[in-house]
A protein has these predicted regions:
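Conserved hydrophobic/aromatic beta-strand scaffold that supports enzyme active sites
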Residues: 7, 143-145, 170
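Short, solvent-exposed loop/turn segments at the edges of secondary structure
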Residues: 92, 108-111, 138-141, 148, ...
């Protein structure tokens, strides 16, 4: 949980709303982020002891874009170690449960992003997909997962698995939410997000 940041961003969104200056449909919406997106001043370890203590100085570009759209960075989520497991397993940071069966694995590698949405902790989680890491946990947790075309969203500030295949994508409850989030991650202006 990025408590101080989340609180500050939520308060700023509330002030904008009160003043009639909302940035768009995602202004004030809390979003969870897979632990491979650089987050300024917050450990970004990709679920691995190998990267323990890695604290980036700036946000990943997709996080900057989402913040500019008014989203609230709720915190970082569990993931398969170094994004290398379609099951969502991680012996280093533990494995989150599957919403449909607490004894089942959630799918991965964006396991925590899926769990955060499936258990109603956030309306959207941001993950990465190289070989199914958004699609698998979305399917296993009754969510919508959007695997974007390689190159559509920036990988700047994203810990890579296979840079030529890696993509960034949202895990949400609805197709409409995924489409809105895609626009925010791209850096689209709010008007471009409307119908």
């Amino acid at each position: 949980l990025t408590e101080a940041r989340a609180r500050a961003e939520a308060q700023a969104a509330a002030k904008r709303a009160k003043a009639g200056l909302r940035r768009g449909p995602l202004d004030g919406v809390p979003i969870s982020w897979k632990d491979l997106f650089d987050t300024a001043g917050v450990a970004t370890e990709a679920g691995s002891a190998l990267l323990k203590g890695r604290v980036p100085g700036e946000d990943a570009l997709v996080l900057k874009n989402a913040t500019a759209a008014g989203t609230v960075c709720l915190g970082k989520t569990h993931m398969s170690e170094l994004a290398f497991s379609g099951l969502g397993l991680n012996p280093v940071t533990e494995t989150p449960p599957c919403v449909n069966d607490a004894d089942a694995v959630p799918g991965g590698s964006s396991s925590g992003a899926a769990a955060s949405v499936a258990f109603d902790l956030a309306p959207c989680g941001i993950g990465s997909d190289t070989g199914g890491s958004v699609r698998i946990p979305s399917a296993w947790n009754d969510l919508v997962g959007l695997k974007t075309t390689p190159g559509r969203l920036s990988l700047q500030g994203v810990v890579p698995l296979v840079a030529s295949f890696d993509t960034v994508g949202p895990l949400c409850r609805t197709v409409e939410d995924a489409a809105l989030m895609l626009g925010a991650l791209e850096g689209s202006k709010p008007a471009a997000l409307a119908g």
